[in-house]
Structure formats: structure tokens, C-alpha cells
Amino acid sequence: MQYSEIMIRYGELSTKGKNRMRFINKLRNNISDVLSIYPQVKVTADRDRAHAYLNGADYTAVAESLKQVFGIQNFSPVYKVEKSVEVLKSAVQEIMQDIYKEGMTFKISSKRSDHTFELDSRELNQTLGGAVFEAIPNVQAQMKSPDINLQVEIREEAAYLSYETVRGAGGLPVGTSGKGMLMLSGGIDSPVAGYLALKRGVDIEAVHFASPPYTSPGALKKAQDLTRKLTKFGGNIQFIEVPFTEIQEEIKAKAPEAYLMTLTRRFMMRITDRIREVRNGLVIINGESLGQVASQTLESMKAINAVTNTPIIRPVVTMDKLEIIDIAQEIDTFDISIQPFEDCCTIFAPDRPKTNPKIKNAEQYEARMDVEGLVERAVAGIMITEITPQAEKDEVDDLIDNLL
């Protein structure tokens, strides 16, 4: 027998009251985006659960994708059979013979949403349990905590059987907590910060600063590949490439070396905030971890934050590097993050950066530059690409855009 569908149960949605259907619809769309790499799979959702109809797709591959989607508590692969007692008996026997191992206990759990069916739930449990004893004479029934709990559901259109429950990712459906702009450098920390924001339902857009010719096409692709890894948790993500060469050259020419990193980060924060405003974001998210590098001391954070009133979320701020690496390996971003491409935060990094920069000093050095003009030109030059779980589709779309 082949699985016909996957029954998906929701996570924290039960607490959302009147907004429940908005959350469910968002989760359905996220599941559809993530499973778009399996064209034959169709997804539906109602108030109680969602269903992914396999239509011949490989269950194992689809299940691996579903495990990553935030907002799912658990799911079960399901067999669909004709709504007939004899067909059900045969199906139950086949399933049990396939999964039973010596010494296992079992239980039949039946329920009917179609109350016109010829047997009620108790009678169905007895009838199907008897069929199991016929097929496996030595099997033992056990009502509490059996090894196999074979669930049977009678609906109007058919009967459905399942015995396995797979744990989901939990969290909230991506997009139900508003939008945030993720400052994505290409290192280890920022993708992990993005992942943790996604888990709490934040719809992220990835803002990446590129400084060609100092940064290479490889560095840009690395950031896009990291973004693609994050799409498996909630669907498509907008990738925003910001031209940053002019600003970095201006900072290098007009500011002392000790303040290069502080001023660079202040410009990045201004630009990200401007993009956030245009694209209706609510917060800025970054991968800063307290004390990890010179720009991540409390004094540096204060000096950099001074250019915006927008809330800055730092999901990894209290984590040790090894804790961050553990998550990066778990979500499969680590190997990409350590690829040897320099990003714009490292190309002009000073040997001895200021660890306790003063806001008044930063403002004094910025007064030598046309700050507003530099920011406006950078924002005007952004390029936006929608990153999907399907790399080939993105590449074809980019090719078409280039031709046009």
C-alpha cells in the first residue's frame, strides 16, 4: 500500500482565537511554497488540520521538507481506502503484517465523521481488531500506550488509516508576526539569527551589502545560497542586494582607521532602515553576538543603534560561538557560511578597531561626507530577487530579467 496524503496538525495556532483562520491560511501558503519542489503535491487546510495530497510523490522526501516548516506540531502519513468494512479489514491486516514485529502490542482507534457508516466507532474497533487477530494470531492488544496505535477515520468520501506520528518544527507560521529586515552578511551568525526569527513567525527579507570589485560574485552567490537554505522553514524570501562600494570607499578616504567598522555599520543600519520603511517592515534583525568582535561590544552597539529608532532584534546576542555553530550545522548553513569569500565587513576591516566608539566622534567623521546622498544612491540601486526552494527556477527568472 502507498500513502495517499499527509495529515498535518497545527502547533501554537490553537491559542490564536479569532485570528485562527488567518494563521491557518498563512501556514497553508507556506507549506505550498516549501513543497513547490514536488509539483504533484496539493495542499488544503481547514480549522482543524491541513492535508498534503501526495498524488504519487515520494512520501519520504515530502516528509523531510515538512519537518522544517514552522507552525506544524506533527503530521501523519495516511492510507486512503474505500469506505467498506471488508476493504478496511483487508487494509488493516496488510498494514499490521507490514509493520508488526514479535512482541509488539496494538490498538485500533476509530472515529466517524460520517455517521451513516454501518458500524459505530466501538463496533469498528472490535471488527478491525478481530481482523488483526486473524492475520497475526499471537499479537496482544493493549489499550494504554500500545506499540502500534492504528487510527481509522471514516469520512464522507473515503476511509483513512494511519499509525505513525512525526514531530514537526513547532513555532509560528512565517509571516504571522509581521515583517523584519535581516542583515545577512554571509557569515555563520546572521543566517542563524534569520532562522530564529522565522521560528517566531517573522517574515524576513534578506538585506545583503555588496562592494564589487572588492567583493566577488562568489560572495553574492554565497549569501543567496544561505537565503535559499532559510526558505525551507516558511517559503520564498526576498533577497535585497545593496550596492555599497561608494560608501566604503568614502569612509576609507575620510575617517580614521579605528572608526571604519563603526561608520560602516552605521551606514548599513541607516540603509536597512530606509529599505524597511519602504517595504513596510517592522524591525531590523541581525546576527550580533555580544563581545564576539569589536563591532559587537555594548558601546559599539549603542553607537551603531544611534542612527535609528527602529527596534533591533538580535536573536543570538547571548549565545556562545559554539552554540551558534551547532544551530548552523543543524539548519545546514554552516558549510556555506565558511566558504572563503570575503564580505564587505571584512575587506576594509582595520587591524585595531575601536571597541568603545563615541557617538559624537562618529558624527564628527560623518560630517565630512554627504551621508544622505550616499544613503539615497545606495537605496536607489538595490536589486531584489525572490529566492525560492527551487534554485533552477530562480536562475531562469534572473536570466529572463537580464534579457528584458
UniProtKB/Swiss-Prot annotation:
Catalytic reactions on record: [ThiI sulfur-carrier protein]-S-sulfanyl-L-cysteine + a uridine in tRNA + 2 reduced [2Fe-2S]-[ferredoxin] + ATP + H(+) = [ThiI sulfur-carrier protein]-L-cysteine + a 4-thiouridine in tRNA + 2 oxidized [2Fe-2S]-[ferredoxin] + AMP + diphosphate; [ThiS sulfur-carrier protein]-C-terminal Gly-Gly-AMP + S-sulfanyl-L-cysteinyl-[cysteine desulfurase] + AH2 = [ThiS sulfur-carrier protein]-C-terminal-Gly-aminoethanethioate + L-cysteinyl-[cysteine desulfurase] + A + AMP + 2 H(+)
Pathway this chain belongs to: Cofactor biosynthesis; thiamine diphosphate biosynthesis
Binding site for ATP: M183, L184, H208, F209, R265, G287, Q296
Domain of life: Bacteria
Listed CDD domains: PPase_ThiI, THUMP_ThiI
Residues covered by the THUMP domain: 60-165
SMART domains linked to this entry: THUMP
Molecular-function annotations in GO: ATP binding; CCA tRNA nucleotidyltransferase activity; tRNA binding; tRNA-uracil-4 sulfurtransferase activity
Annotated keywords: ATP-binding, Cytoplasm, Nucleotide-binding, RNA-binding, Thiamine biosynthesis, Transferase, tRNA-binding
GO biological process, one term: thiamine biosynthetic process
Localization: Cytoplasm
GO cellular component terms, A-Z: cytosol
PROSITE patterns named in the record: THUMP
EC annotation from Swiss-Prot or TrEMBL: 2.8.1.4
InterPro entries: Rossmann-like_a/b/a_fold (IPR014729), ThiI_AANH (IPR020536), ThiI_fer (IPR054173), ThiI_N (IPR049961), THUMP_dom (IPR004114), THUMP_ThiI (IPR049962), tRNA_STrfase (IPR003720), tRNA_sulfurtransferase_ThiI (IPR050102)
The keyword ATP-binding belongs to this UniProt entry's keyword annotation: yes
First-tier enzyme category under EC: transferase
Gene3D superfamilies xref list: 3.30.2130.30, HUPs (3.40.50.620)
Function: Catalyzes the ATP-dependent transfer of a sulfur to tRNA to produce 4-thiouridine in position 8 of tRNAs, which functions as a near-UV photosensor. Also catalyzes the transfer of sulfur to the sulfur carrier protein ThiS, forming ThiS-thiocarboxylate. This is a step in the synthesis of thiazole, in the thiamine biosynthesis pathway. The sulfur is donated as persulfide by IscS.
NCBIfam families: tRNA uracil 4-sulfurtransferase ThiI
HAMAP family linked: ThiI (MF_00021)
Name listed for the protein in its UniProt record: Probable tRNA sulfurtransferase
